[in-house]
Amino acid sequence: MTVGIYEQQDFTGGLNLRADQFQLAENESPKMLNVDVDPRGGVFTRGGYTAINSTVIPSWNPHRLFRFDGDAPQIMLSNSTKVYRSTGSNFSTLQFSSGNDIAIGSSFGAGFAQWGKTLFISTGTSGNGGYKYESANTYASALTANGPTFQPYVSPTGGFMPCAKHLAVHANKMFAANTIENSVAFPNRVRWSHDSLPEDYMTDDYLDVEGGGNGITGLVVVSGQLIIFKPRAIFVLFGYNSASFQIVELSNRLGINTPRSVAQSDVGMYFFSYPEGFHYYDGSSIKNIFNQLQPIMDLNYLDITTKPVDVSWVNSRVWFAVPYSVTGTAATKATVNFVYDPSINAAGTYTMFQSSDSYGLLGGINWENSSGVSFGLMCHANIGRVVSVDNYEEQQDNLTGTASNFTTYYRTKWFDAGSYIQKKMFRRPDFVLKEPDAATTITVDVYHNFDEADGNQRRTFNLTLTPDPTAMAWGTGVWGTGVWGAGAASAVVVTGSNLGLARCVQLQFSGELGKKWGINSIGYKFQSRRVKG
């Protein structure tokens, strides 16, 4: 009897949660956790998370991190009530005088905008004009709130800024939105400073954006455009001065509820609109990128009434932190990250990450320390730690000073060799696996005939891998006088056990805790049985 073979070498479709398994592409997965997608085709264990601060930040309710490139690089953090700063390790509160912390009065947290080597901070507190801060200074300097006092063009004085909830630098001006002027709230107002003078504002230099619900919820600059978010609309400010500024509606359906739900990338912005999902804007059009994850909304796996969906752009990928739960009990904090890589495939690729203590990460930035070393930094959703991500040399998370293991698995789509009608005897498959740097075991669960419920696997076997002592391993091998870099140098072929008689099969690979692993290819072997009428 002829033995058929099929080799799967492409896994770049990533995670796709659509309920109908027949819609999955050959390179997509219905279930994966803490594995990264290799652009060249394989999957492998994600990098570890490592906390940068040994001292826990108190009263933890993080909003966002901000990269401040002043005289010395600093990490700024907006909590629910205070502003913190760090040079790469522990955090301290930012004060405006000895013993006086900057207080935040906005539910959105602090607004940050860098102008030259100066950081401007809005607090959203009535009567407070915000602060300016330089990294060389011990304290921030208070600014006087605009309204009732404004500065004519002919006599700028400096030292002023509107009381606002959002800040952005655009067209050589400082923009402030959702303002409070002389104790009167103007939630739909956008003000801008004099040209080149971020501390002076003219009385009539503002626009009120009334459509899309009450209150401006975010400002982002994309491709020379100032994007103004409302709860149910998105607007674009075109022009370059008070005489030419005009508002154009980009969408009257999409919007955000908090600035945490939008992140600026290198060439555009990503945002979450409820209930429409994740979207991307490149300066010309809005693209829906939520198709692969639509069931999480349809099945009510997200509860954003307790926590917003947080969006970060870290290490050239989008990290969507969501309160995700499939148990029927609403999650009160971000439990996972759906990580989207726009560089893989035309539609981009998703995977799902979760920390070793079962939480997501949020408020992320790309940051570079004074030595020029780059880090992807994010806030832990539950404990007062800021962590670096994508540490591929680490096999565990270190969130509290002690390393801890995280769960990893990857499940294939159903494989039916072209026909689910015909039964097949699935023989021993071959696997091309990434060679480990330490002995490890991968557990393979085999499911039959579209019965994919957890615990219903028909067979289970192990793939045992040991590093080749004669092979040149990255980081340890020396060739002549040159020492090689980091990472596994090769792959190994391992044969599994029979998969059994079935119409179709599905495999789930689960890695050993605390060990790296990866798959480059799956080679199926099968013998088709005669079809009975």
Label every model-predicted segment:
Residues 82-88, 130-145, 181-200, 237, ...:
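Short beta-strand segments and strand-loop junctions that repeat across beta-rich extracellular domains
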Residues 48-62, 92-106, 143-308, 351-354:
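Beta-propeller and closely related beta-pinwheel folds
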Residues 126, 181-182, 514:
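Short, solvent-exposed loop/turn segments at secondary-structure junctions
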Residues 65, 128-131, 136-143, 167, ...:
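Generic beta-strand hydrophobic packing signal
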Residues 116-120, 124, 129-131, 161-162, ...:
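A short, charged
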